[in-house]
Amino acid sequence: MPTHRLTAFAAAPPEAVFDLWIDLDRMHEWVRGVTKVTDLTGSVTQVGTRYVTWFGPMKSPTVVLEADRPRRFSTRFGSRILRGVNTTTFEPEGSGTRISEVMRTEGWVSEITSRLFSLGSYKGSYQGELNDFARLAEREADGG
């Protein structure tokens, strides 16, 4: 199972960073291609909650595996081109938060797709999206 490890720093408290991370209505602000999130079965802070993330016409059913505010959030996701488990931790570091993301993909199609998204830090790459998220969390912490 291919594994991708990413990290970024946000000059914002872990609680605020975690809360932004699980705000499904705002996911499109840092995850490229997300057009909507539907079919939410409960609170994303509850293990077992399900929802569907849409990338245009393609859906990615998702289930919450772990939600430990403000420290850790994990989901299993899956579409026909990318599926696996994403676990993100939020650790206090100085005056901010170290965000560490581990994505384990499943299947050969996911392996190829994930490899493309894992290269570099361009907008739309895994690292690029995490960097965008960290900057957004900092703007939110600054009130704006």
Q: Which residues does each predicted region cover?
A:
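Beta-strand/loop substructures that line and gate deep hydrophobic ligand-binding cavities in soluble
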Residues: R76-G128, F133-R135, G144
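Generic structural detector for well-ordered beta-strands
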Residues: T7-A11, T38, W54, V63, ...
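Short, surface-exposed coil-to-beta transition loops
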Residues: T3-R5, M58-T62, L82-T87
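A short, structured loop/turn motif at beta-sheet edges
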Residues: A11-E15, G42, L65-P70, T89-R98, ...
